[in-house]
Each structure stands twice: as structure tokens, then as C-alpha cells.
Swiss-Prot record:
Protein species of origin: Rhizobium rhizogenes (strain K84 / ATCC BAA-868)
Protein name from the UniProt record: Urease accessory protein UreE
Residue span of region Disordered: 137-167
Pfam families: UreE_C, UreE_N
Positions with biased composition (Basic and acidic residues): 149-167
Organism ancestry: Bacteria, Pseudomonadati, Pseudomonadota, Alphaproteobacteria, Hyphomicrobiales
Keywords of the record: Chaperone, Cytoplasm, Nickel
């Protein structure tokens, strides 16, 4: 069985994957896992640190061959606002509830939740059930937990940190 110990970000030039693995958003945060490829083969993902993979990222097998990460279609709500200001207001309400959301110019996608749907419709949004890939925005608290920048540095950014709780 082939092992995967590295990856390349989506859009890497001159990359031709030999296979794909389709995963929903909640299964794309990985470090070590046996992955079942579309062709029926399996590979062992074995990374040094967890990575939050995006649609189109490429896993690099030990033999150099590439496997594409594909965002699986998921049952979502498509939220359409009245205008751009309304979209910002709706996004604020979703963020205030710590919900994963894919925010686009003219719509927001979230996982289906009928309580949230009622709230959004009460705020004047049009909410429709859709099934499509989900790539939620990465939150501020996850800023250093996704893709590596290829170098190490301290995270002090020139200021003191004051620990506090949001409880």
C-alpha cells in the first residue's frame, strides 16, 4: 500500500493526478488516515501535522504520483439576501452562532439546520435546499491550523498575548 507524506496546494502548476478521493468538509481535516480512492485502491495518509484540506489540494504518494482531494456534495442551505448589506448582516448572525459558512458575493452556504433556516427566513433571507461541495471559510482561530507556509516562525507578531476566555 502506498503512503502519502506530503501534499501540494490546489492550483499547483503542471500537476496531473492519477486518482481522486472525495471527502465532505468535516472529513478533510486530516493527519493520519486510510483513504479509499475512487479507483478502489487505498493509500495511507501519514502527515507530521494535521492539515485542513481544500477542494483541489493534491496528496503526494511516496512514488511521486498525485491524488486530488475533491469536496463531496453535501446537503446545504443556500441563503440569498435582499442585497449586499443584508448578506453582511446574515453572515454576522451565522458567525455569532459559530456556524461554518461558505460566504460568496451573492449567497451564503451552510449545513442544513431547520432552526437556523427559520431564523434566516425571519430575517428576510430566501433559503433553498441544495446539494453541492462545501468549502466553509476558515475561522480566525484556525488561521495557523491549515496549510503550512513552508517556514517556521514565532506567532508573537511583535505584541504580548493576553490569554482570556470567551466563556
Amino acid at each position: 500500500m502506498q503512503r502519502v507524506t506530503s501534499y501540494l496546494p490546489a492550483g499547483t502548476p503542471s500537476s496531473n493526478p492519477i486518482d481522486r478521493v472525495e471527502l465532505p468538509h468535516d472529513l478533510r481535516h486530516l493527519r493520519r488516515k486510510l483513504l479509499h480512492l475512487e479507483n478502489g485502491e487505498m493509500v495511507m495518509l501519514d502527515l507530521k501535522e494535521p492539515v485542513l484540506f481544500a477542494n483541489g489540494d493534491l496528496l503526494v504518494r511516496e512514488d511521486g504520483e498525485l491524488i486530488e482531494i475533491v469536496a463531496a456534495p453535501e446537503k446545504l442551505f443556500e441563503i440569498k439576501p435582499r442585497n449586499r448589506l443584508h448578506l453582511i448582516e446574515l453572515a454576522w448572525h451565522l458567525g455569532n452562532r459559530h456556524l461554518s459558512a461558505q460566504i460568496e458575493e451573492e449567497r451564503i452556504l451552510i449545513l442544513r439546520d431547520h432552526v437556523i433556516r427559520a431564523m434566516l427566513e425571519g430575517l428576510g433571507a430566501t433559503v433553498t435546499e441544495v446539494s453541492e461541495p462545501f468549502q466553509p471559510a476558515r475561522g480566525a482561530y484556525h488561521a495557523h491550523g491549515g496549510h503550512s507556509h513552508g517556514h517556521d516562525h514565532g506567532h508573537s507578531h511583535g505584541h504580548d498575548h493576553h490569554d482570556h476566555s470567551h466563556d
